[in-house]
Amino acid sequence: MAPARLFALLLFFVGGVAESIRETEVIDPQDLLEGRYFSGALPDDEDVVGPGQESDDFELSGSGDLDDLEDSMIGPEVVHPLVPLDNHIPERAGSGSQVPTEPKKLEENEVIPKRISPVEESEDVSNKVSMSSTVQGSNIFERTEVLAALIVGGIVGILFAVFLILLLMYRMKKKDEGSYDLGKKPIYKKAPTNEFYA
């Protein structure tokens, strides 16, 4: 049983490594920007043909075809990546980078801060967080969530009590009708407890 588990673990590990290698493959971002591939319609690995490669290069029929390719290669080929591997993002002068110069647009763009009361001006406002559990000087019943919870809890409790009373009344009524015959003999008999001395 142990070799089967080891083999299954090995297959799982190889599948995970293959998937992580596949995730690191590079897709040309220019193709995505030009709109060749839409959402989910990325090219398949077999369909991608690099420059200088033709589809005939990959169609080898079997033994003997590989020898012809080795003879035509003179030296080691240096593979240059098609996409530069830097992370530089070019600055574009688009509509998002325009700074408004007209006074009317500047006024519309302003963010007006909230007014701070004179008592709170001395405190550090950036770290002040209003939490419902830290509110001081307020009654617990003034908060709406507490009132809602109390009302819902009361309604559920009253319904539970009503159903319990109805169940008890139903059982008492059934008992009065005689459906429970207490004078009935039991199905089993108790074994005699006589002791015999030998």
Swiss-Prot record:
GO biological process: cell migration; inner ear receptor cell stereocilium organization; negative regulation of T cell proliferation; neural tube closure; positive regulation of exosomal secretion; positive regulation of extracellular exosome assembly; positive regulation of focal adhesion assembly; positive regulation of stress fiber assembly
Pfam families found in the cross-reference section: Syndecan
Chain positions carrying an annotated carbohydrate: S39, S61, S63, S95
Protein's UniProt keywords contain Protein biosynthesis: no
Gene Ontology MF term list: fibronectin binding; identical protein binding; protein kinase C binding; thrombospondin receptor activity
Topological region Extracellular: 19-145
Keywords: Glycoprotein, Heparan sulfate, Membrane, Proteoglycan, Secreted, Signal, Transmembrane, Transmembrane helix
Keyword Transmembrane: yes
Distribution of this protein across tissues and organs: Detected in fibroblasts (at protein level). Also expressed in epithelial cells.
Family matches, as InterPro entries: Neurexin-like (IPR003585), Syndecan (IPR001050), Syndecan/Neurexin_dom (IPR027789), Syndecan_CS (IPR030479)
Transmembrane segments: 146-170
Signal peptide per UniProt: 1-18
Changes after translation: Shedding is enhanced by a number of factors such as heparanase, thrombin or EGF. Also by stress and wound healing. PMA-mediated shedding is inhibited by TIMP3. O-glycosylated; contains both chondroitin sulfate and heparan sulfate. Ser-39, Ser-61 and Ser-63 can all be modified by either chondroitin sulfate or heparan sulfate, and the protein exists in forms that contain only chondroitin sulfate, only heparan sulfate and both chondroitin sulfate and heparan sulfate.
GO cellular component: cell surface; costamere; extracellular exosome; focal adhesion; Golgi lumen; lysosomal lumen; plasma membrane
General function of this protein: Cell surface proteoglycan which regulates exosome biogenesis in concert with SDCBP and PDCD6IP.
Subunit-structure text: Homodimer. Interacts (via its cytoplasmic domain) with GIPC (via its PDZ domain). Interacts (via its cytoplasmic domain) with NUDT16L1. Interacts with CDCP1 and SDCBP. Interacts with DNM2; this interaction is markedly enhanced at focal ahesion site upon induction of focal adhesions and stress-fiber formation.
This protein's name: Syndecan-4
Annotated organism of origin: Homo sapiens (Human)
Encoding gene (name): SDC4
